[in-house]
């Protein structure tokens, strides 16, 4: 069995139109919290792939970063960078969640890292045909579902912990800023009333020196 036996690469291209709002799945938006961008077609510079309602977007550029995106929503006008391969999962053969974790597995990632084409500098792309022809072995569907469910639950917990840590860091930064502001106000409050006395003391000292 090969990857092409469990997913279908959908290569329908879209030319964005001015005045139409699109949900764009791009590499920058993946890196920035995996949230698609809402853009007018006039702000999108090139043709994109149409994104099915339920699919997996597999990035063919620099696969070592594992930019693999699960999509499962009814949003209209979903499009993606052509650096992604939109893959519809054959759920009669493979569990959707299991398929996702299979595609980001070390074995597939390491294999593809050795199959890069167009390799120059930091931009290394895979050949989609090489990817789709990778041989795989699937466990029974019941085992797939169990594995997919377990790994998905772990990822969910990791994401929640990340959000908690991000909020704590933001809260600490805000508290530190407020502390610095309050400390500055306290210093000014302590020093300001004494400025006339300080000024007179300096003048007195100068008078003594002159005498």
Region spans (language model):
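Short, well-ordered beta-strand elements within core beta-sheets of diverse protein domains
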Residues: 68, 85-90, 132-138, 152, ...
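A short glycine-rich beta-alpha junction/loop motif
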Residues: 1, 78-85, 119-148
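Non-catalytic DNA-recognition/assembly elements of restriction-modification systems
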Residues: 1-14, 30, 137-211
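Short alpha-helix capping/helix-loop boundary micro-motifs
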Residues: 36-46
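Short, basic/aromatic beta-hairpin or loop at an interaction surface
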Residues: 22-37
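Short coil/turn segments at secondary-structure boundaries
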Residues: 16-23, 113-116
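A short beta-sheet element
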Residues: 47-49, 53-108, 121
């Amino acid at each position: 069995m090969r990857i092409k036996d469990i997913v279908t690469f959908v290569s329908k291209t879209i030319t964005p139109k001015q005045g139409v709002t699109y949900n764009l799945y791009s590499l920058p938006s993946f890196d920035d919290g995996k949230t698609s961008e809402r853009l007018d077609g006039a702000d999108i510079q090139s043709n994109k792939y149409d994104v099915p309602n339920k699919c997996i977007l597999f990035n063919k550029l620099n696969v070592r970063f594992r930019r693999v995106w699960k999509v499962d929503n009814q949003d209209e006008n979903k499009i993606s960078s052509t650096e992604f391969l939109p893959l519809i999962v054959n759920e009669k053969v493979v569990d959707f969640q299991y398929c996702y974790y299979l595609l980001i597995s070390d074995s597939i990632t390491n294999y593809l890292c050795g199959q890069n084409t167009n390799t120059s500098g930091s931009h290394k792309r895979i050949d989609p045909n090489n990817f789709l022809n990778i041989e795989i072995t699937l466990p029974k569907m019941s085992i797939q579902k169990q594995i997919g469910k377990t790994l998905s639950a772990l990822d969910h917990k990791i994401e929640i912990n990340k959000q908690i840590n991000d909020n704590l860091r933001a809260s600490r930064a805000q508290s530190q800023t407020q502390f610095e502001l309050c400390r500055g106000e306290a210093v000014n409050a302590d020093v300001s009333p004494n400025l006339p006395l300080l000024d007179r003391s300096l003048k007195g000292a100068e008078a003594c020196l002159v005498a």
